[in-house]
Regions:
Chain A
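Hinge/lid segment of periplasmic solute-binding proteins
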Residues: 98-148, 202, 285-289, 370-372, ...
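Extracytoplasmic/periplasmic solute-binding protein
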Residues: 135-144, 149, 173-220, 226, ...
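A structural signal for short loop-to-beta-strand junctions that line the ligand-binding cleft
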Residues: 90-92, 120-157, 187, 297-301, ...
């Protein structure tokens, strides 16, 4: 076929061009920081645009071009992986959540930042967050922020019903019933079946530890009694019709927050900016309480911690490292990111005197960071780690949760199925794996 | 001959002389009572409401601020601010929307023109030249019509990444140049509309094969060309999977990808809802106007090219 | 066209072997035969997604074709006012790309935003467009909205090419409108109907953009809702390109089998008059 042959020829010619282009420009390893550099940076963190503007003003030689992307698991990780696979089109820098870092390391997609300066800078960061981006002897990302959890709730609606912020999950279930009984349109929260990262954080809080590494062998322990306890707790609320099961971060949910049909949200510190951005008319009516507890010892969890990583194929790894460290340690940058609501800083001593330590109008004047999140951050079980196929595990949980919501099986079933499927995922990657801790 | 082929060739013998059968002045309608007429019009009107309702909603929504988008009825105006919204759309992020629009036009325009010429040439070769494996090629093309384009997008990505073309204009353009349906249509049409005697005569006059194709055959196959062009243009314009897989650089995005990007970013940046809606409005309205005003060509192309062939 | 398929088949029989917790010990592609196909067909979610698009096709295709044919016949009857306006109105959505149509309808399906849901609840109806029982048909509605007008136009074009003498003869013979439709029009537009049917089958089996856009709005759409979604997810979220390639090949085979099967069926069913 003439046409196909022509195309084949064009492809071949283009391929030759591409190869010559590759060989004529050496891979970006030049390490002179005074050299001009143009970097692209993918991020979805609110407020990061202002920090980037500030950097660009102060560093005319290293210009960063920010591209605001959808949240990582909403397609941006897919784009990064495909660009890495293709060997081109990946950004120099990217936002990567902690649970996704091992996956990028496995695909050989990240630059080891330790020899570029992170080795020296690492003392600036909170240990456990630094641990999330350290694999073996390498540091693959600059920690940015974590998401210590708390309970956002509509204080006005709770107190009208004579409810206090629930201190335990049992009290939470009682509150769920009181709220729904008083007004059938109202629910305490939604169990978003498509957002298993949220469920994972709740299991984390309950004391579960899903993943580990024993020498070269990955361990998977998702279906532990602890996790099953959490799953069956939400199963009971769902079966009693006391919670919604609509997707979070979606129009319907925003609409429910706005009109008071959803009155609470066990969420992370960064959740406040989501609420204030999407339900502006409810300002002043929210408060934050510590996450409800399972036991007498206070425990919290992290949801949505994130880092800034330098991707393979960058034109200037040194400049990129410099920017990534600045972004996450410079006081001015941190306060811009805090204003956007990026989470809890990974840099040490960021609370005192910063914009974090002040009352918030949206929360009716509560200083939630000081009251709740500081202690929450200190009570996270920091031994939690991830596996290179965390995204698959989330998918399995999502699929199982969605099936349960549609009336096929339960959340407990979903957790059990995810255990088996996760072991198969790691095996499919050609890795060694076993069940248990 | 398959049935689809008959779809194109079914009427060829009869209508070759009259190019526009619809204009033949004969009483083709049987007159009905007014009651019947009202009934039919009512049925058509109900269908029209269904097809136009989302367009109406989009138009109303495009005039709203983000807060009244969520806080007011979707059917009525509420402090209309269409102009502000549209200015936001075209100026956001350094005018990236205009870039996406141009990209869409580039992918669709160039893709459709080249695909049309290639398809006609290939179809003509398949129809008028005998060479080894001709039927095999034609059957491959036929199978190509049946294979969903999206099933090929992923393999194409892997292939393009091998040759380093991913995330370039080429990665979306090259696959768009291939139109098995166009080749198929080209062959059917060439069989019917290009008389062998005319070719013989030109060859006797000493015209080269290329000249014959570009001066004579292309002209004869114009109606098929219009159909293939429009078909391919809309196909590329609407394509989503291929650019999604191929492109990671936002400045290469077509409109479809860009708007989905805005829509999915909006979970953390609520102001982008209004941009996504305003962008949808801006991109849909011109195409709708174009489609309706080009309806004549669609019809002509379909009648001449597909149905009558 | 042939090249990507061949390459897909090559990728689909390949797997990967690694050593070390992060593959530091090196990784290499290995020939795994039909393992990826066995994995794909052994995964209940992927098989369910194939079943889902087939169910979708079985319902969607007749609805689409009947609607398009009915609209074409009504327009052609020309007993109505404003035929030109109606024809344009029906054809208009064809210019709206699938993803944009999905964004649009997504808003119209969302409780709290949608005038349709509000209207329904005012009437005491609890309309749930995004739930597990209805989401597939909500998607079908988007597809129908987008393409019914186009299919109608193809059929209208063939109706126009019917020789007017036939109608004259029919009216002289005293045929009524229904007889004209069933005896003359329908048999003569059969080729156009076959054509639109084949294209509708191919279109429905490759369902991707609509569920992708609606996924964040609906709990019922999983990452493997359709075969294409599953392949996309395997390739780019899970980095399992080999499995994704196998799924693409399977999808192409199913689509081919269906379209050819349909063509065989109508060809054997006797030739149109």
């Amino acid at each position: 076929m003439k046409r196909i042959r022509t195309i084949a020829a064009v492809v071949a010619v283009a391929a030759v061009f591409a190869t010559t282009a590759c060989t004529s420009t050496p891979p970006g390893s030049s390490s002179d920081p005074s050299e001009k550099a143009n970097l692209t940076f993918w991020s979805w963190v609110p407020g990061v645009d202002k920090a980037v503007d500030l950097w660009n003003k102060e560093n005319p030689n290293i210009q960063v071009k920010l591209e605001q992307t959808p949240a990582g698991s909403s397609g941006t990780y897919a784009k990064m992986y495909s660009a890495l696979k293709a060997g081109k089109g990946a950004p120099d820098l990217a936002q990567i959540e902690y649970q996704e870092l091992p996956g990028f390391v496995l695909e050989n997609g990240l630059v080891d930042l330790k020899p570029l300066g992170m080795g020296v800078e690492s003392s600036k960061f909170v240990d456990w967050q630094l641990g999330q981006s350290t694999f073996g002897d390498s540091v693959y990302a600059v920690p940015q922020a974590s998401g210590p959890m708390g309970l956002y709730y509509r204080e006005d609606i709770f107190s009208a019903l004579g409810l206090k912020a629930p201190a335990t999950w049992d009290e939470y279930a009682v509150a769920a019933k009181t709220i729904h009984d008083a007004n059938p349109a109202q629910y305490i929260n939604t169990f978003a079946p498509g957002n298993s990262a949220w469920f994972t954080a709740l299991a984390w809080q309950a004391g579960a530890k899903w993943f580990g590494l024993d020498g070269d062998t990955w361990t998977v322990n998702i279906d532990s009694d602890t996790t099953l306890k959490v799953a069956s707790y939400w199963d009971k609320l769902r079966e009693a019709g006391l919670i919604k099961t609509e997707p979070d971060f979606a129009n319907g949910w925003y609409s429910d927050l706005q009109n008071g049909n959803i009155v609470a949200w066990p969420s992370a510190q960064w959740g406040g900016s989501i609420l204030s951005g999407n339900a502006p008319t409810t300002a002043g009516k929210w408060k934050v309480a510590p996450l409800p507890q399972w036991d007498s010892t206070y425990a919290s969890a992290n949801w949505g911690g994130s880092s800034t990583a330098v991707l393979k194929g960058t034109s200037n790894a040194q400049a990129a490292e410099k920017f990534a460290v600045w972004l996450n340690t410079d006081p001015q940058s941190i306060s811009l990111l805090l204003a956007g609501g990026y989470g809890w800083p990974a840099a040490k001593n960021a609370l005192a005197g910063s914009t974090l330590d002040k009352p918030e109008e949206f929360l009716g004047g509560q200083n939630a960071n000081k009251d709740v999140f500081k202690k929450s951050d200190e009570s996270i079980n920091t031994s939690w780690g991830w596996i290179p196929t965390t995204a698959n595990t989330y998918t399995h949980l999502n699929d199982g949760f969605q099936a349960a919501v549609e009336g096929h099986g339960t959340f407990v079933d979903a957790v059990k199925a995810a255990q088996t499927a996760t072991i198969a995922d790691l095996e499919a990657k050609g890795l060694k794996v076993r069940a248990g801790d | 001959m398959t049935t689809t082929e008959r779809a194109y060739t079914g009427k060829k013998g009869k209508n070759q002389s009259s190019k526009q059968p619809s204009t033949v002045q004969k009483p083709r309608k049987i007159q009905r009572s007014p009651g019947w007429r009202i009934l039919v019009t009512a049925a058509l009107a109900v269908a029209a409401v269904y097809f136009l309702f989302p367009v109406y909603w989009l138009t109303i929504a495009a005039t709203k601020s983000t807060s009244s988008l969520f806080g007011s009825s979707g059917l009525a105006l509420d402090n209309p601010q269409l102009l502000t919204n549209l200015v936001n759309v075209v100026t956001y992020n350094g005018g990236i929307f205009g870039r996406w629009a141009l990209n869409s036009v580039l992918y669709s325009g160039v893709g459709a023109v080249v695909a049309t010429i290639c398809s006609l040439a290939a179809g003509y070769c398949l129809a008028k030249f005998t060479f080894r494996g001709r039927e095999v090629w034609f059957n491959i093309i036929l199978a190509g019509v049946m294979i969903p384009g999206t099933a090929l997008a992923l393999p194409l990505f892997l292939l393009m990444s091998q040759v380093g073309l991913v995330n370039t204009y080429w990665s979306v353009l090259l696959p768009s140049l291939v139109s098995p349906f166009g080749v198929y249509l080209g062959r059917i049409y060439a069989q019917a509309a290009v008389p062998d005697s005319l070719l013989e005569a030109s060859r006797l006059d000493g015209a080269g094969e290329f000249r014959i194709f570009f001066t004579l055959v292309l002209r004869l196959m114009m109606p098929a060309a219009v159909t293939i062009f429009l078909f391919q243009f809309i196909g590329i314009w609407n394509n989503f999977f291929l650019p999604l897989v191929m492109l990671s650089d936002q400045s290469l995005y077509p409109i479809t990808l860009g708007l989905v990007q805005w829509q999915s970013v909006s979970d953390r940046h609520p102001e982008l809802y209004q941009l996504a809606i305003g962008g949808a409005f801006l991109s849909v309205i011109p195409i709708m106007i174009a489609i309706v005003s080009l309806q004549r060509f669609w019809k002509a192309g379909l009648t001449e090219g597909s149905v009558k062939g | 066209m042939v090249l990507p398929l061949v390459y897909a088949i090559y990728e689909s029989v390949t797997g990967i072997q690694r050593s070390g917790a992060f593959g530091q010990g090196g990784s290499s592609p290995v020939f795994v035969g039909l393992d990826n196909y066995i994995t794909a067909l052994g995964a209940s979610a992927f098989v369910a997604s194939l079943g889902r698009v087939l169910l979708f096709a079985v319902v969607q295709v007749p609805v689409m074709i009947i609607l398009a044919t009915a609209l074409a016949l009504l327009l052609d009857a020309a007993s109505a006012w404003g035929v030109r306006f109606f024809r344009s109105a029906y054809f208009l959505p064809y210019g709206v790309p699938g993803v944009i149509a999905s964004i649009l309808w997504g808003f119209l399906y969302t409780p709290g935003l949608s005038p349709l849901v509000n209207f329904g609840s005012a009437l005491g109806l609890n309309l749930d467009f995004l739930g597990g029982g209805s989401i597939l048909w909500s998607i079908a509605n988007i597809v129908t909205w987008q393409y019914a007008g186009y299919n109608m136009l193809v059929i209208v074009a063939q109706l126009k090419s019917i020789d007017a003498d036939l109608f004259e003869a029919a009216s002289i013979d005293g045929a009524n409108a229904w007889q004209v439709i069933t005896r003359i029009k329908l048999p003569l537009i059969r080729p156009a109907i076959v054509l639109t049917t084949v294209f509708t089958i191919i279109g429905t089996i490759q369902l991707f953009a609509e569920p992708l856009v609606l996924k964040p709005l609906s709990s019922a759409i999983t990452s493997s809702f359709t075969p294409n979604l599953s392949a996309y997810n395997e390739a780019f979220a899970n980095n399992n390109y080999n499995l994704a390639a196998a799924e693409s090949v399977l999808l192409a085979l199913v689509a081919c089998a269906f379209s050819f099967g349909f063509l065989k069926l109508v060809t054997r069913g006797g030739s149109p008059s």
